[in-house]
Amino acid sequence: MNNLFSRKAFALLALICFGFAAMQATFVGGRTDFRDESIYFVITTRFYDGDPGNNAQCWDAPASMHGDPAWRGDFKGLIEKLDYIKALGFTAIWVTPVVENASGFDYHGYHASNFSKVDHRYESEDVSFQTLINEAHKRGMKIVLDIVLNHTGNFGEENLCKQFSRDWSANQYLIDACMTPFTQKDGGKLPDDYTDLIPGMQYDSRLALMKNTDKKNHDSHNYWHHFGQFNWDDNTRWYAQIAGDCVDLNTENPATAEYLIRCYGSFIKMGVDGFRIDTGGHIPRLTFNKMFVPRFLDIAEQYKHMRGGTPFFMYTEVCARFQGSVTYRNQPCLSPYFYTWKENKEYAWNYDSTYWDTKEVYEQTSLASLDNIASCEQQYADNSHETASAMPTSANALLKGNDYHTPDVSMASGLSIIDFPLHYSFHDIASVWNTAIEGDKYYNAATYNVVYVDSHDYGPGPNDGQRFNEGTAQWAENLDFMFTFRGIPCLYYGSEIEFRKGAVIDKG
C-alpha cells in the first residue's frame, strides 16, 4: 500500500510540475527567451518506432539483442509522440545527432562518418528531418539538435578522409556487406589487404590516416589533432582522443571549422531552434569564441525567419564529474562556467586554412609551434593557475532586493552550458541548493543553464553509471526543484515514469 501511495504521489506531483510548465508555455512561435522553454531529451533511435521498415541492428550487437534492433526509433515515431511530449508540458525537444554514423555501436549518433548528410536509418519514404522540424513547429514546439564538433568516428569522414563506401541498400548489421574499404588500388588510402587484417590492425590502419600515428603525413591538411597524451584534468583534453570511437578533430584549423560550420549551418537553415554541443569541454573556449559561436549566430540571424524570428540558443557539455564546487578540480578554465564568458584579453588567431597545409604534425610536435593552438595554450597558461576568486563574477541570476534588473550580458560568450555541478548533486537537494547559491556568480548568467537530473551519459554522483534510482520521493523533490528554480529544466525521456530506473546507462 505504501508503495502504491508513493507511486501515485509521484505521478500527481509530476503532473503538477508538468502541468505548471504547460500553463506557463504559450506554445506559439513568439517565445523570445529560451528560458521560457522546458526541454524533453530523447535518443531518437530508442524512443519510438514509427517505421519498422527502417530498423537496423548495430555491427557489434550480441545475438541476444537481435529482437531489439538498436536503430529502431526514428523521425516518424518521434512525430507520432510529439503530442504526448507537448501534453507533458514540454516546449522543446533535444534530439541526438542525426548525421551519418559508422561504428560498432552508433545508434546514439556521436560517431560521425559524414557530417553533410542525415543518416538514412532515421528516415522513412514520407518522413525526413525537415518533416520533424516542421511538425514540431506546427505545434509551437522547438527542436534542439545535438551536434558534435570535437570528433568523428574512427571509420573516416566522407569529405575529410574517405575510407569506405557505404551501401545503404545492404544489410546494415553486416559490416562487410554495407562498408566497402576504399583501398589504394581504387585510389584510396587504406591498404589493399585491409579485409585480411585482424580487427586491431584494421583500426590502426584507419587511425593512421587521420592522426599520422605511423609517422607518415597522411593527414596533410591537419583536419584532425595528432596529439597523443590525454588527461581529463589538464589542457591535453582539448587536443587528444577521448575514446577509440572519438577521433579528435583539429577545431583550431579553419578548414576543419568551416566544414563543420557549413554542415551544421545547413540545419540552422532548415529551422532548428538551437544546438546542444557535445563534448564542448574538449574544445578550448577560445576556439568557440573565435570560430564557432559567432559563425553559428551569424547564420542563425540570417535564417531567423525559419524559426519564426526567435533567437537561436546554444548550450554545451563541459563534463565535470565533481561535487561540492562549480570549479572543476581547482581549474576554472576546465569548468563549465568558464565557457559562458567572452575573452578578457585579445589572443591572435590565424583564419588562413592554407597555413595548416604547410605543417607536418605528429604526436610529439610542440603545440606551442602551431598557430591558434599556441593561442589556446596561452589562454590556458593565463588561467590555469588562477583560482575561482580571480574569475569574473555576475549578479545576473540574482534579484536586487525584490526588484528585477536587466541582466548585463555584454561579456556573455553566447554559449550556455549544461549545469554539471547541479546534475552531479541531484542525489540530495541540499547539495544542489548549496552548489547553486555558492557558485552561480561565476556563470555569466546561470538562469540560462540547462538543468537535468540524469542523461544518456551519467546519473548524479556517486552512482553515476546508472539511471537515477534514489527513490520516488527524491525524484519528486528533484522535479519540484528543476521546475521552480533558476535554469532551463530538461528531462531525459522516460523519467516521467521512472523508466529503467537503476539500469546501467548505455555505453555505446
Indicate residue ranges for each PLM-predicted region.
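Active-site region of glycoside hydrolase catalytic domains
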Residues: D36, G153-T251, Y351-A412, Y442-N444, ...
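The substrate-binding groove and active-site-proximal loops of carbohydrate-active enzymes
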Residues: P62-K76, H111-S124, I242-A257, D273-I283, ...
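Active-site-proximal helices and loops of the catalytic beta/alpha 8
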Residues: I133, H137, H151, R262-K269, ...
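N-terminal structural segment of carbohydrate-active enzymes
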Residues: A25-L145, N150-C161, D167-Q172, D176-A177, ...
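Bacterial N-terminal signal peptides
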Residues: A11-A21
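Structural recognition of the beta-strand scaffold that forms the well-ordered cores
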Residues: S38-I43, A92-P97, N114-K117, K142-D146, ...
